[in-house]
Amino acid sequence: MPKRGKKYLEALKLVDRSKAYPIAEAIELVKKTNIAKFDATVEVAFRLGVDPKKADQQIRGAVVLPHGTGKVARVLVFAKGEKAKEAEAAGADYVGDAEYINKIQQGWFDFDVVVATPDMMGEVGKLGRILGPKGLMPNPKTGTVTFDVAKAVQEIKAGKVEYRVDKAGNIHVPIGKVSFDNEKLAENFAAVYEAILKAKPAAAKGTYVKNVTITSTMGPGIKVDPSTVAVAQ
């Protein structure tokens, strides 16, 4: 285990590690235990009772945070003709086809999200080995393979975030910055939690949400009592 600094250990003393906090208290603690000198990201981690090795227990999707993430994503859209014009009008940072495929193959990654029209996926598929490991491959489940490129770009710019269960059954999602109002962080948290609940696979057995933790970029994890979060079940 890596050696922790003095500031981290001081912050850790503020947290009762045996307790699951109401969301309002947890957010307050995240701010108190933030030791970064920059506007740190606040992230939520869910430990789920699923077996990601089974195809029917994979979880992947996206949710629009009501107050965004505090960062405006750079969007690359693979599209042609009218769809390319729609993407540009919606605010996409980069729009094109073959030239961007070539740039990526040469190591260019000045973007955060990739959107593609379905007719472009034959070409974009060539980038699978490059974009896949980085979590950047367009996917219908996250709304990034679509003919409605304008809507996709607008949602991403407004604060749409993707989530995907990892091999250990965890999902990590950013919900804003420590500078956000507590209420905005709570509402972003609730939006993500509701999306995770709705994404529960029918094949999942036993307790679905086993543990919920929020943390700032360099701060300690704080357990959340999800029963204190108002969501539409």
Curated annotation (Swiss-Prot):
It holds the Pfam family Ribosomal_L1. The keyword RNA-binding applies. GO terms for molecular function: rRNA binding; structural constituent of ribosome; tRNA binding. One of its GO terms (cellular component) is large ribosomal subunit. This is Large ribosomal subunit protein uL1. Binds directly to 23S rRNA. The L1 stalk is quite mobile in the ribosome, and is involved in E site tRNA release. InterPro entries: Ribosom_uL1_bac-type, Ribosomal_uL1, Ribosomal_uL1-like, Ribosomal_uL1/biogenesis, Ribosomal_uL1_3-a/b-sand, Ribosomal_uL1_CS. The keyword Chloroplast does not apply. CDD domains: Ribosomal_L1. Keywords: Repressor, Ribonucleoprotein, Ribosomal protein, RNA-binding, rRNA-binding, Translation regulation, tRNA-binding. GO terms for biological process: regulation of translation; translation. Part of the 50S ribosomal subunit. Belongs to the universal ribosomal protein uL1 family.
